[in-house]
């Protein structure tokens, strides 16, 4: 495990050595999506960055427990359900399914646990009751608010000073509720029931939880009072993460998280990409446009996770070119192993670099060390990518020759060095979640590729959820005509195979 791993901690505003609470173990909580719509590129950036963090920690020898939530009850979900004439549950389930499909397409490892707010209601009610008993919360006309003036540390994450602030900190509370608050920054822990909205029983009357208390309760339930790392986008520093800290620490008297990491925003034309501004592009639309998942990963990882990421055609083109070269190098062992006389093995262990010449050993050891040094330096993914491109250069040249039909021309020592170089490239690429993509081509009897089939299955699932069974049957019949058989499994899962 690296002793030199350092992170820039939003809480302390310093880049610090990382030391987990328990040696060799890391507990991580990542704020998930509010499931009212499809995910956009901004979400992709967050979850690609944190996927790489998780992969690097695992590769470095840590046992990682990674928890990421779904916010499945929220004003935005209720608004979408009302617009569709649907239910909160239907909107949530549809978008949770879509989230999984998008993340799987991007090669993002699924979290170890994915709690939902609606399945953590008992923990939420318990936490609110504890805050009320300690004088940190108060009731007002069926609502319950957190009293920010009762928590001395409020503002320590965002740097906000309560004395200078006159606007509310809830982020999702209407102006009409301000009169009931003791301070403008007080935020809702429990919202009293409203006509026509789902509600749940509580000691304060029927209602539903506020946004921030959900995460505090899920962190506590899944990982305990104090965790190693808390993740999210920079837009969550205030109010969401500030409020999480306040309510959790007021209840437990313990530090919520040792390290807070926040990724920068994706910008379009100088503005943050967001659904509210209407300047967003969904992950699904990008992939359906022909952009490969690995190109999208490379685009994200070319920038440091804390810096803004400009979404431009030129940046995507550069990522496409870069991935084409890396993919060609990664393909060597799969496409040309016989011509090279290679017997590809599993990726090398973290310390196992073997070559027949000392210069080759030095080259590969240096590459591994520089990769680790970059990642240890606050997840410098662009520096790590530079090592991958350096490793790939002679492999890409060899791949180009083989594609032209030129016979390989190297002695045994050269061949061994190239094999070890390829194995190391494959290993380090996997740490960044980069995997070989074969060129698109007609597959067996069908011209449909896997991504198109999965998209059709998603469309069929949505049709069934909307009770448009005629459309669902049409999609099944269309796939069947192209040799694709669908197998529906319990839990709404659909598998497929080529007939």
Curated annotation (Swiss-Prot):
Gene3D superfamilies for this protein: Cysteine-tRNA ligase, C-terminal anti-codon recognition domain, HUPs
Motif ('HIGH' region): 33-43
Disulfide bond found in the keyword field: no
UniProt subcellular location: Cytoplasm
Keywords: Aminoacyl-tRNA synthetase, ATP-binding, Cytoplasm, Ligase, Metal-binding, Nucleotide-binding, Protein biosynthesis, Zinc
Pfam families: DALR_2 (PF09190), tRNA-synt_1e (PF01406)
Example GO BP: cysteinyl-tRNA aminoacylation
InterPro entries in the record: Cys-tRNA-ligase, Cys-tRNA-synt_Ia_DALR, Cys-tRNA/MSH_ligase, Rossmann-like_a/b/a_fold, tRNA-synt_1_cat_dom, tRNAsynth_Ia_anticodon-bd
A single Gene Ontology CC term: cytosol
Binding site for Zn(2+): 31, 215, 240, 244
The record's free-text note on cofactor binding: Binds 1 zinc ion per subunit.
Binding sites annotated in the UniProt record for ATP: 275
Assembly notes: Monomer.
Protein name as catalogued: Cysteine--tRNA ligase
Originating organism: Synechococcus sp. (strain WH7803)
Taxonomic lineage from the root: Bacteria, Bacillati, Cyanobacteriota, Cyanophyceae, Synechococcales
Gene that this polypeptide is encoded by: cysS
């Amino acid at each position: 495990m690296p002793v030199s791993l350092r992170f820039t901690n939003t809480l302390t505003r310093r880049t610090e050595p990382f030391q987990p609470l328990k040696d060799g173990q890391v507990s991580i909580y990542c704020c998930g999506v509010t499931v009212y719509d499809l995910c956009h590129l901004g979400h992709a950036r967050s979850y690609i960055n944190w996927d790489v963090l998780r992969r690097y920690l695992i590769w470095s020898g840590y046992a990682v427990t990674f928890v990421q939530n779904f916010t499945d009850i929220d004003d935005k979900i209720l608004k979408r359900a009302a617009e569709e004439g649907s239910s909160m549950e239907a909107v949530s389930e549809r978008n949770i399914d879509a989230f999984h499909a998008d993340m799987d397409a991007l090669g993002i490892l699924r979290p170890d646990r994915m709690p939902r707010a609606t399945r953590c209601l008992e923990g939420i009610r318990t936490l609110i009751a504890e805050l009320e008993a300690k004088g940190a919360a108060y009731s007002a006309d069926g609502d319950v608010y957190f009293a920010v003036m009762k928590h001395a540390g409020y503002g320590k994450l965002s740097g906000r000073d309560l004395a200078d602030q006159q606007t509310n900190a809830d982020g999702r509370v209407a102006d009409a509720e301000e009169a009931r608050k003791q301070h403008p920054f007080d935020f809702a822990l429990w919202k009293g029931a409203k006509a026509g909205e789902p509600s749940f029983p509580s000691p304060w009357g029927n209602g539903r939880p506020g946004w921030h208390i959900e995460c505090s309760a899920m962190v506590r339930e899944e990982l305990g009072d104090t965790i190693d790392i808390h993740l999210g986008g920079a837009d969550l520093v205030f109010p969401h993460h500030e409020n999480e800290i306040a309510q959790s620490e007021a209840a437990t008297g313990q530090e919520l998280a040792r390290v807070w990491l926040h990724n920068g925003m994706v910008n379009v034309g100088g503005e943050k990409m967001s659904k509210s501004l209407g300047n967003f592009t969904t992950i699904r639309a990008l992939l359906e446009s022909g952009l490969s998942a690995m190109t999208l990963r490379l685009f994200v990882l070319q920038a440091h996770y804390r810096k803004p990421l400009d979404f431009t055609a030129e940046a995507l083109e550069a990522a496409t070119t870069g991935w084409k070269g890396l993919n060609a190098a990664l393909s060597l062992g799969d496409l040309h192993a016989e011509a090279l006389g290679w017997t590809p093995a599993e990726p090398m262990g973290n310390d196992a670099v073997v070559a027949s010449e000392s210069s080759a050993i030095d080259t590969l050891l240096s590459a591994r060390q520089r990769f680790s040094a970059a990642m240890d330096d606050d997840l410098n993914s662009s520096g790590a990518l530079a090592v991958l491109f350096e490793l790939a250069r002679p492999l890409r040249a060899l791949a180009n020759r083989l594609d032209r039909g030129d016979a390989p021309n190297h002695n045994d020592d050269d061949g061994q060095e190239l094999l070890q170089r390829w194995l190391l490239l494959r290993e380090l690429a996997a740490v960044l979640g980069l995997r070989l993509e074969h060129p698109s081509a007609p597959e067996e009897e069908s011209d449909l590729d896997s991504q198109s089939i999965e998209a059709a299955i998603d469309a069929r699932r949505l049709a069934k959820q909307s009770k448009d069974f005629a459309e669902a049957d049409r999609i099944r019949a269309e796939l069947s005509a192209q040799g694709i058989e669908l197998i529906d499994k319990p839990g709404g899962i659909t598998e497929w195979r080529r007939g």
